[in-house]
């Protein structure tokens, strides 16, 4: 039976909140330390479309959706709702919406809980109407993006809430799933976190293997200063207080405290005394993050936000 098509709004997103910094359409540009960017507006569909197309091509294979095409008439119109099956934070509607639109541009998606929204079990996130074949064919790819990115946003918000009333801000890292970093970084922002560098080209971060290859902390910083000049801000990773003092003496503007216990971080904060931005990294869990924040560091970075978040349980049901 063919259902009458109702008038529904096309997919749309709210404008950036006051104080947010928009990125350009290419997500380009460079930023200086501190490496934290407070914006939540979604990345351009121009950048997202190739990722969604690749996911659809992977799912459709050579023959397409042979089950749906065999049993659903091409004229069948259907309505569906995407709803939360557990509490969390929504992220990824831009990718989910594109998945349906790329299968059939006649699909209409109405957002009920925009990206960045906190939802409870049963909350309607979006409503869909259009060719039933398109809804069925795009369903899994759309949900794959949505449950993963909402999981990233939810995990981020949990850390953000845990460090509330401290000065520490939660940031993500480059430990992302290959190919979808731009979406994962966006999901972190939806959860209230901030972004560290997007790639190797937009900020300097001297890691432990750089130090080993270059011959030490001071040697690494000196080499960078000679190559990049005095205007480029330098962040360097240290795991001892001796390395911290060496980095400060060499003029590092930001220092990453790698896998230090909170007690040692407190000493690092006292030694630094405001001379550099301090980032804590390593072993960041929901149980430990408050103690890390109370050490007095400026930023807390977590790779787990993007490399191993729990997927938020969401479902799509026909009405």
Where are these regions (language model features)?
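Acidic/glycine-rich phosphate/pyrophosphate-binding loops and surrounding catalytic core
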Residues: 3, 36-250, 254, 263-271, ...
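C-terminal active-site rim and adjoining tail of enzyme catalytic domains
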Residues: 259
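Intrinsically disordered, low-complexity segments enriched in serine/threonine/proline/glycine
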Residues: 22-24, 33-35
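Glycine-biased, low-complexity coil/linker segments
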Residues: 18-20
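Generic short N-terminal amphipathic or hydrophobic helices
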Residues: 10-12
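Active-site loop ensemble at the mouth of alpha/beta enzyme cores that anchors a bound cofactor
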Residues: 315-319
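Compositionally biased, low-complexity intrinsically disordered regions
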Residues: 3-6, 16
């Amino acid at each position: 039976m063919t259902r009458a098509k109702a008038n529904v709004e096309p997919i749309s997103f709210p404008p950036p909140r006051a104080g947010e910094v928009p990125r350009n359409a290419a997500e380009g540009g460079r930023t200086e330390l501190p490496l934290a960017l407070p914006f939540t507006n979604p990345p351009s569909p121009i950048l997202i479309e190739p990722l969604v197309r690749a996911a659809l091509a992977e799912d459709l294979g050579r023959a397409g959706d042979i089950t749906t095409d065999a049993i659903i008439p091409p004229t069948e119109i259907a309505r569906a709702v995407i709803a939360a099956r557990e509490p969390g934070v929504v992220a990824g509607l831009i990718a989910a919406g594109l998945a349906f639109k790329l299968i059939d541009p006649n699909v209409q998606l109405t957002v009920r809980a925009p990206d960045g929204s906190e939802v409870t079990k049963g909350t309607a996130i979006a409503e869909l109407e259009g060719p039933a074949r398109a809804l069925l064919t795009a369903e899994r790819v759309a949900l794959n993006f949505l449950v993963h990115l909402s999981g990233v946003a939810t995990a981020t918000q949990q850390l953000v809430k845990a460090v509330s009333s401290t000065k520490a801000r939660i940031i993500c890292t480059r430990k992302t799933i290959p190919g979808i970093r731009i979406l994962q970084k966006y999901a972190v922002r939806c959860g209230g976190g901030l972004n560290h560098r997007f790639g190797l080209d937009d900020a300097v971060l001297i890691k432990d293997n750089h130090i080993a290859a270059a011959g030490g902390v001071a040697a690494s910083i000196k080499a960078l200063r000679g190559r990049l000049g005095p205007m480029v801000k330098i962040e360097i990773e240290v795991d001892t207080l001796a390395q911290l003092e060496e980095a400060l003496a060499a003029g590092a503007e930001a220092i990453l405290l790698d896998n230090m216990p909170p007690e040692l971080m407190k000493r690092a904060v006292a030694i630094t005394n405001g001379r550099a931005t301090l980032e804590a990294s390593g072993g960041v869990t929901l149980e430990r993050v408050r103690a890390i924040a109370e050490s007095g560091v400026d930023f807390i970075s977590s790779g787990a936000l993007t490399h191993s978040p729990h997927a938020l349980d969401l479902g799509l049901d026909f009405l």
